[in-house]
């Protein structure tokens, strides 16, 4: 026999599942967008150490985001972590091989690696 108590319990269970599957993902998407935007804004403003922390935080939540990895790789290159930059670009390429940006960014990082390792400065300067 169906009682009003059973109906209330059924509605409650349906309500809980709807919240889990419809409301939670939209919150998650907003959090994702907010984290990405914050990291990108810090990068654009030249606050690279803070940007690196934010990209790390973002990638803790979304480790398979190729764009996030590529952007973190760019920040790593700017602060002098050339090998870390190349690693991030390689991961981004493996996740999304049709995206061109990580290939370009990896090439820039590899060029920087070669340029910096073979760079010799003159010991005397002529005026």
Question: Could you tell me what each predicted segment is?
Answer:
Residues 32, 66-67, 100-101:
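Helix-start (N-cap) detector for alpha-helical repeat units in TPR-like alpha-solenoids
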Residues 117-123:
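Conserved small/polar residues in nucleotide/adenosyl-binding loops
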Residues 44, 78, 112-113:
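Register position in tetratricopeptide repeats
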Residues 57-60, 91-94:
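Conserved structural position within tetratricopeptide repeats
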